[in-house]
UniProtKB/Swiss-Prot annotation:
Lineage: Bacteria, Pseudomonadati, Chlorobiota, Chlorobiia, Chlorobiales
Alphabetically ordered keywords of this record: Cytoplasm, DNA damage, DNA recombination, DNA repair, DNA-binding
Subcellular localization, as worded in the UniProt entry: Cytoplasm
Protein name from the UniProt record: Holliday junction branch migration complex subunit RuvA
Pfam families per record: HHH_5, RuvA_C, RuvA_N
Location of region: Domain I: 1-64
Length: 204
């Protein structure tokens, strides 16, 4: 019914986001993966949407990428997997790692995700492997995605660490982006240390 929503990000947490569009505020349930990629509140943002309808409620799920939405919809096709568990899977692993776990028949990668035990992991792989292969152009493998995702994950982790330390997200994003533009071959710890030094000097 809905392809995506583009509007002003009013607020968000690790599992929820509110977007205002033409005077109407929409509440989205999101994964931790999407939450880590959202900009500051007050910024314009676009979320790919999935409307889930049940007898007592209509729920909007939002995704930062079309890939994540496609995988969410695929997970819903597995027996015993509802929106809550599907979102938990997407919060526990990056999209390409979930894809590879299913395609390569490695249920161990799904263990440890909240709500996913051995039987559930095995069932997801058994029921979805053939289906996910048809989505491979939309959901590329880790090999194809690794360079981009490694850099993106490094950036996201560094920004999250700085925000956790109390720095404004905007300042953290700007500083981390600048540092990685200069040198992308570094660890999260190195980026955070350099960022802390830059932010400290800027405040002097």
């Amino acid at each position: 019914m809905y392809a995506y929503f583009r509007g002003t990000l009013i607020s968000f947490t690790a599992d929820e986001a509110i977007i205002e569009l033409q005077g109407v505020a929409y509440h989205f349930l999101i994964s931790a993966t999407t939450s880590r990629q959202l900009p500051n509140s007050g910024s314009e943002v676009q979320l790919f949407a999935h409307l889930y309808v049940r007898e007592d409620a209509m729920l909007l799920y939002g995704f930062y990428s079309e890939e994540e939405r496609q995988l969410f919809r695929l997970l819903l096709q597995a027996s015993g997997v509802g929106p809550k568990l599907a979102l938990s899977v997407l919060s526990g692993l990056p999209v390409h790692e979930v894809h590879d776990a299913i395609v390569s028949n490695i249920p161990e990668r799904l263990y440890g995700i909240s709500g996913v035990g051995k039987k559930t992991a095995a069932r997801i792989i058994l029921e979805l492997r053939d289906k996910i292969l048809k989505l491979s152009p939309v959901l590329p493998t880790a090999t194809a995605r690794r360079p981009h995702n490694a850099a993106q994950q490094l950036r996201d982790d560094a920004i999250t660490a700085l925000v956790t330390l109390g720095f404004p997200r905007a300042a953290a994003q700007k500083t981390v982006t600048s540092l990685l533009d200069e040198n992308s071959n570094c660890t999260v710890e190195e980026v955070v240390k350099s960022a802390l030094l830059l932010i400290h000097n800027a405040q002097l």
